[in-house]
Design a protein with these regions (language model features):
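Extreme N-terminal starter segment of soluble prokaryotic enzymes
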Residues: 1-3
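Accessory recognition modules or surfaces
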Residues: 102, 154-163
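Conserved glycine-rich acetyl-CoA-binding loop
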Residues: 68, 88-106, 125-132, 136-137
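Conserved catalytic-core motifs of GNAT/GCN5-like acyltransferases
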Residues: 121-125, 135, 140-158
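Acetyl-CoA-dependent GNAT
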Residues: 5-11, 16-94, 105-111, 115, ...
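Short coil/turn segments at alpha/beta junctions that flank glycine-rich nucleotide-binding fingerprints
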Residues: 98, 115-118
Length: 164
């Protein structure tokens, strides 16, 4: 099990991992049309490349013991004052429940401590089973939000926080 820093050569891999994760995890939560809309807008080459050009935004590829990619994370330091935002953490279906998510969250915590940020925030769909994982890792719900993301779709999320 390991994590490696992603770079522009990994954009296609990140897109494939996102597609695999979203298409298996979200159909019971949001319409398939919304999944495809969000994948297209949030995981375009330009979107990921712009993140990678931001020195405070980091992507890591999550690998299993055979060094095969099973997921990724994306987080941004200084998203707000004293705050790191965990934007993305996704695993392939077969990687869920094997500690990869916890390891990735610990990496974000370690990186956040090195910046002297005092908290990590994330948004999670209110019906996403990952909510329990975040809670088990010390995150607490601090708010809820319904975001209009265009094309008639919304994200109905909890905002969660981890404080150091």
């Amino acid at each position: 099990m390991g994590l490696r820093k992603a770079d522009e050569k990994d954009i296609t891999l990140i897109q494939k991992l996102a597609q695999s994760s979203w298409r298996s995890a979200y159909p019971s939560i949001i319409p398939v049309e919304q999944i495809e809309y969000m994948l297209k807008s949030m995981y375009s080459d330009d979107e990921i490349c712009n993140h990678m050009k931001n020195s405070d935004f980091h992507y890591f590829i999550i690998e299993n013991n055979k060094q095969e990619p099973v997921g990724f994370i994306g987080f941004e330091h200084y998203f707000e004052a004293d705050t790191t935002k965990l934007h993305r953490i996704y695993l392939t279906q077969d990687a869920i429940g094997h500690g990869f998510g916890k390891e990735a969250i610990n990496l974000v915590k370690d990186h956040t401590l090195s910046t002297l940020n005092k908290r990590i925030v994330l948004n999670v769909n209110k019906y996403n089973p990952a909510l329990k994982v975040y809670q088990s890792q010390g995150f607490h719900i601090i708010d809820e939000i319904v975001l209009d993301i265009g094309n008639g779709y919304v994200m109905d999320d909890y905002i969660m926080e981890y404080i150091f």
